[in-house]
Each structure stands twice: as C-alpha cells, then as structure tokens.
C-alpha cells in the first residue's frame, strides 16, 4: 500500500527513473537476493516501506514471525544500501514504536522512555531496531538516512483480510459484508473507547517525497494529521459511508489495544508539510478502492 502510493506521488511530481520490486520479484528476507539487487541497480535514493504488518490478532498470534521478518528485511535493505553507496535512504516505521502510556500527543523525543504496548511489542521492537540502525550508520559512517513514523494508515491497495488487517480496512470489509448480507447488527472488538488517528496513504507519500528532498537528521519525523477520534466514532463513520443502518454492538471481552495514540506533528508542520485528505473523504476513496478490487478482500 505505502510503496505503491510513493510511486504514484513520484510519478505525479515528474520523476521517471523509478526502480521497484514486488515481493514476488524480490524477497527482502533473503540477504543474497537483496545484495544482488543493490549491486545490480545501485539505487541512489531508497524508500524502505516494506514490512510484515497486521492487526491485533495477527500480532498476538505470530510474535516471533513479526519480529524476525521485519528485522531481517530492514537490516538486509539498509545494510545493502550502505554497502552500495546509496546517497539517501528513508525508513518508514510506525507510531507503535512509542510507549503505551506516552504523553499525548506523542513527540518524537518520547521514543524509548517507557514500556511498549504488549499487543504489538514484537513489531514495535523491530521497527525501533531499523530506526536505530539508520541513526547509528549516520553517526559512524556519515550517511544521510532518515526515518518517518506514520500514524495509522489507510487507502488504495490496503489489506482487507478479516483477521490480518488493521482496524479501518477491517471495518470497511465487515460493514460492506453486513450490508450485502442484510445483517441487522455488527459486533466489534473492545468497548470503542480507544482514541486513534488516521492518515490517508497518499498524504503520507507526499510527506515521504517532501522529506527526501528537504530533511536530514537522526531524529525521526512523525507523520499524521494531529486529529483523533474514538474507535466507536470511527466505526459509526465507516458504517455511514458504506450505508449500513443496523445496530453496532461491542464485545468488551476482546482487547482494546493502546488507549490513545495521537502523534505530535508539529515537526513536520514546521518543515512546511500538512496533510490534505479529511477522514470521511479518505474512507469514501478507500471504499471505492475496495469495491473496484474485490480480490483484495481475499488476502
């Protein structure tokens, strides 16, 4: 999702010498394949957006896989970029790197100040490792490797799998299927109280290209809107966009996840960037993408 959005943004801005690889074409967990790719292509600027991702269920059921796969692919790409003289690399992490009870909104400086959220600790530790490896290469070898920490993302090419997707695409699929089947109610996990922030993926892509051209530094840059809503409010908004008119119930025996996740985006704003897509508009665009690409629901 993120990689394709960055390609769209680069093309929109007139860039033409763009090299991409799908997972089928290049397995980033294979060190030999990654090294061969960098030795052959010698990319000067690298956006590292690839990751093994998933929602609460996937993270809880595959802790070791999430940590191993993400650490391996990150280290393979970042190290091969350094070995082959890459001029600049941009590493994309996640807001889950910040402590569970971090002061809100979360500033970049609160990294590693207290305990992580247990439901996605493995993924968070892997992302922190990638971020720190970029920082240490900068300090030891004078590289220009930067990192961006996005809030919850959504948009075209999202993963709508019923158990392995994040909350917003999962809600889109559930309410679409409920509407199509004529269901009178939908039950959601938790109690709907957690506060979340959402950024349309094309807005993130715009920031990524902006930072590649305008920012250098060891400290990461938060990517978000600076606006939040409860999961209950999000659920009602998705139901409204899709046209589901039944009852929404909550199963409080299921986990809520982190109680609040709002990024402080003042750093990005001071650099001259702000988001463009409001949440309801983005959900409509995402639902159109879901309807136009039904096979995505099978992933």
What is each of the regions a protein language model found here?
Residues 95, 171, 226:
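Conserved short acidic donor-positioning loop in nucleotide-sugar-dependent glycosyltransferases
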Residues 101-104, 158-162, 234-235, 260-261:
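Short aromatic-enriched loop/helix-cap "lid" or pocket-rim segments at secondary-structure transitions
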Residues 119-123, 151-166, 190-202, 225-227:
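Glycine-rich "substrate-gating" loop/helix at the edge of Rossmann-like oxidoreductase active sites
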Residues 74, 150, 168, 172, ...:
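Alpha-helical structural signal
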Residues 5-9, 13, 177-299:
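C-terminal substrate-binding subdomain of Rossmann-fold SDR/epimerase-dehydratase oxidoreductases
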Residues 129, 133-137, 167-171, 234, ...:
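Hydrophobic alpha-helix immediately C-terminal to the catalytic Tyr-X-X-X-Lys motif of short-chain
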Residues 1-159, 285, 292-293:
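N-terminal Rossmann-like NAD(P)+-binding domain of SDR-like oxidoreductases, especially those catalyzing
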Residues 1, 54, 166, 229-230:
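Short alpha-helical
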